A protein has these predicted regions:
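Bacterial N-terminal signal peptides
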Residues: 8-19
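Blade/loop signatures of beta-propeller domains
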Residues: 23-33, 131-133, 195-205, 262-280, ...
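Acidic, Gly/Ser/Thr-rich repeat motifs that build Ca2+-stabilized beta-propeller blades
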Residues: 23-174, 222-225, 230-238, 290-328, ...
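Beta-propeller fold detector
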Residues: 35-36, 73-80, 132-141, 195-202, ...
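Beta-propeller blade signature
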Residues: 120-129, 180-193, 248-249
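Repeat-solenoid scaffold signature
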Residues: 208-249
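Conserved blade-ending motifs and adjacent loop-strand segments that build the rim/top face
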Residues: 217, 332-353
């Protein structure tokens, strides 16, 4: 990995005040304390903490489990049928902003149809004892269904007003990320019931899907709101190189596949790419020349460990690490890689109610790890 700063490039439009920054120099890894708090999970993909400190965990083959008191429940009944081939399956999980009153749990998953598959989102009501999910209803479907098993995106995030944002991969069909009549390679904004807000940027334009909030994305598997600015941050997989962190702006084009810092897995240029920048498009805040294969993202805004304040934690699948980006406002000041010694693919990252960082390892016998700062080496 190249470890020098690239020069800042001012955006051609006013979406962002910062230019893209290549991966920053990394200090020597700091020690962390790690404990395995759950094991035997089948390719766990996401977790969401409940108000009582327990957590819901999705397993990609199609199960939802409750972790409570150090133990995993049996699979919770009441889930939809998922398309669990290749990269598909049961993916993200999020709680309703009003969960304490309504008990609604949102799930993103791959759904088969028309001979292919696409991302779907639904919600159901979790029983008080956490043993069943009732009245599951699909509230959103990616159309058309184009995936043969790749690039679902499928992260969920609610903003402070209760709107639901969903990241959608381009189903490994590159040009569709620029097609505004399709929902591939997009981030969409919905009401909590799945209906479309009238103030979405393209609402009323019959040539454009009204759900679209931003476009030009490849496979966005990180989505979270910055707790200090309120802005929506996203990260996405590049092809061979070019993983990105972006600040998402209303109606913006993030370039894929017309602009990328990556190349094809074959080593050849992306056929549609015109360079690393797209005229009138938004550039990444931060990018990597060598892809860590980013998945899952969490801002650290807890009080328990001040040394981690204003950090952004990101999972890495290929690099088998927990990436910590130190932030100064909307700038990345430093990067370090944690958990490298474990040799585990990190699929999701969340901050727990106790202030610890929790990560899921992606494996046939995956685990939930609790991570806290240790003594400096």
């Amino acid at each position: 990995m190249l470890c020098h700063w690239s020069r800042r490039i001012a955006l051609a439009i006013g979406f962002l005040s910062l230019g893209p920054v290549q991966a920053a120099p990394r200090p020597a890894p700091a020690a962390v304390q790690v404990s395995e708090v759950a094991s035997g999970l089948s390719h766990p993909w996401a977790l969401a903490f409940l108000p009582d400190g327990s957590a819901l965990i999705t397993e990609r083959p199609g199960s939802l489990r409750l972790w409570r008191g150090g133990r995993l429940s049996p699979p919770i009944p009441g889930l939809p049928k998922v398309y669990a081939e290749s990269q598909g399956g049961l993916l993200d999980v999020a709680l309703s902003p009003g969960f304490a009153q309504d008990r609604l749990v949102y799930l993103a998953y791959a759904e088969a149809g028309d001979g292919k598959s696409g991302t779907a989102v639904g919600r159901g009501r979790l029983s008080e004892d956490g043993t069943t999910l009732a009245d599951f209803t699909v509230i959103f479907r990616q159309v058309p269904k184009l995936s043969r098993g790749q690039h679902y995106g499928a992260r969920l995030a609610f903003d402070r007003q209760g709107y639901l944002f969903v990241s959608l991969g381009e189903n490994n069909d590159r040009p569709t990320a620029q097609d505004l009549d399709k929902l591939q390679g997009k981030i969409v904004r919905l009401r909590a019931d799945g209906t479309v807000p009238g103030d979405n940027p393209f609402h009323g334009d019959k040539r454009v899907r009204p759900e679209i909030w931003s476009y030009g994305h490849r496979n966005p598997q990180g989505l979270a709101f910055n707790p200090w600015s309120g802005a929506l941050w996203e990260h996405e997989h590049g092809p061979r190189g070019g993983d990105e962190v972006n600040i998402i702006q209303r109606g913006a084009n993030y370039g894929w596949p017309l602009a990328t810092h990556g190349i094809n897995y074959s080593g050849l240029k992306i056929p549609e790419a015109k360079g690393t920048k797209l005229a009138g498009g938004a550039e990444p805040l931060y990018w990597w020349e060598k892809s860590p294969a980013v998945s899952g993202m969490a801002f650290y805004d807890a009080q328990a460990y001040p040394q981690w304040k204003h950090s952004l934690f990101i999972g890495a699948l290929a690099d088998q690490a927990l990436i910590r980006l130190t932030l100064e406002g909307d700038k990345v000041a430093a990067e370090e890689r944690l958990l490298k010694d474990r040799g585990a693919r990190i699929r999701d990252v969340r901050v727990g109610p106790d202030g610890a960082v929790y990560v899921l390892t992606d494996a046939p016998q995956g685990a939930l790890l609790r991570v806290t700062p240790g003594e400096a080496k």
